[in-house]
């Protein structure tokens, strides 16, 4: 499930690319006094992913911008919505907005047999654990965290995002449902790396880390209902780590239903 937040700029501003920590703070202010307050910094995924404020670019007073929240927990999104309705000021650092409207969206990869492409809208964080490093012979970089890079090959990346998604499955799915590491088959059919880049990120007040991020296009074909659940969970809870800072948010950019050709999907003969 997704929540679209429609914003109106209150004054001119430069778009801040280092928005993550400030935006997370605004989310938690919307959750103040709710049952989710106790989950702040408890070490477990909240089950929330969110986009950047879009479109990018210099902000002028009166501009319309948007922001998307996604979560497998409908009550979490409902609580955020109520918090934003109570206090419509939406300030992220020097960027000052007011919440103009809220709308609900449903995103689904489709029934079994559906093919499509999921593209990451924000960078994916994959921090390799000591077990991953040992398994794949990756040397640690002094005391700094080891983030996935292309030279590590694709296998550690696949294993890491799958294990991360399993952790989210264990927290948010029904016990009777198999998780992504409980079944055979890849999460995605294709992994097209678009770019990698480093970004200084404030993870807590006074603590900034240089994080290595990657952006992707993932090809998928829905094998069965369990696989459909796993893909939708990735869309709702985010891919990889640091989702609470807005990383790993993704969108479906192509989708072809079973029995439908690419030409039909694109209305090529219209």
Curated annotation (Swiss-Prot):
Active site per the UniProt annotation: 41
One function term, GO molecular function aspect: RNA binding
Disruption phenotype: Does not produce mature length crRNA; precursor is non-specifically degraded. No accumulation of the CRISPR leader-repeat transcript. Allows excision of defective provirus 1 from its chromosomal locus (detected as restoration of the attachment site attA).
Record key words, sorted: Antiviral defense, Endonuclease, Hydrolase, Nuclease, Plasmid, RNA-binding
Top EC class of this enzyme: hydrolase
Biological processes annotated in GO: defense response to virus
Pfam families associated with the record: Cas_Cas6_C
Tagged with keyword Chloroplast: no
Catalytic activity, EC: 3.1.-.-
InterPro entries registered for this protein in UniProt: Cas_Cas6_C, CRISPR-assoc_prot_Cas6, CRISPR-assoc_prot_Cas6_N_sf
Keyword DNA damage carried by entry: no
Protein origin, superkingdom: Archaea
Its biological purpose: CRISPR (clustered regularly interspaced short palindromic repeat) is an adaptive immune system that provides protection against mobile genetic elements (viruses, transposable elements and conjugative plasmids). CRISPR clusters contain sequences complementary to antecedent mobile elements and target invading nucleic acids. CRISPR clusters are transcribed and processed into CRISPR RNA (crRNA). This protein probably processes pre-crRNA into individual crRNA units, and also plays a role in generation or stability of the CRISPR leader-repeat transcript.
PANTHER family the record matches: CRISPR-ASSOCIATED ENDORIBONUCLEASE CAS6 1
Similarity field: Belongs to the CRISPR-associated protein Cas6/Cse3/CasE family.
Note: There are 6 CRISPR RNA loci in this organism and a single cas gene locus. A CRISPR-Cas type I-B system.
Protein name: CRISPR-associated endoribonuclease Cas6
Species: Haloferax mediterranei (strain ATCC 33500 / DSM 1411 / JCM 8866 / NBRC 14739 / NCIMB 2177 / R-4)
Gene field: cas6
């Amino acid at each position: 499930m997704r929540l679209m937040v429609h914003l109106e700029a209150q004054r001119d501003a430069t778009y801040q690319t280092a928005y993550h920590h400030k935006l997370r703070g605004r989310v938690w202010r919307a959750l103040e006094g709710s049952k989710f307050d106790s989950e702040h910094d408890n070490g477990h995924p909240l089950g929330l992913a969110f986009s950047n404020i879009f479109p990018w670019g210099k902000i002028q007073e009166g501009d319309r911008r948007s922001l998307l929240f996604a979560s497998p927990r409908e009550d979490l999104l409902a609580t955020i919505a109520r918090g934003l309705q109570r206090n419509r000021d939406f300030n992220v650092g020097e960027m000052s907005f007011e919440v103009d409207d809220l709308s609900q969206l449903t995103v689904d990869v489709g029934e079994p047999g559906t093919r499509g492409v999921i593209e990451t809208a924000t960078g994916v964080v994959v921090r390799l654990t000591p077990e991953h490093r040992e398994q794949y012979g990756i040397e640690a970089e002094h005391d700094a965290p080891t983030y996935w890079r292309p030279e590590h090959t694709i296998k550690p990346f696949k294993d890491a995002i799958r294990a991360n998604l399993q952790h989210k499955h264990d927290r948010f799915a029904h016990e009777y449902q198999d998780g992504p590491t409980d079944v055979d088959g890849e999460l995605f059919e294709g992994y097209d790396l678009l770019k990698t880049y480093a970004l200084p990120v404030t993870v807590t007040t006074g603590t900034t880390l240089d994080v290595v991020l990657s952006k992707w296009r993932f090809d998928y074909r829905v094998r069965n209902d369990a696989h459909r659940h796993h893909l939708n969970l990735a869309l709702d809870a985010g891919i990889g780590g640091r989702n609470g800072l807005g990383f790993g948010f993704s969108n479906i950019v192509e989708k072809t239903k079973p029995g439908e050709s690419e030409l039909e999907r694109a209305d090529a003969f219209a």
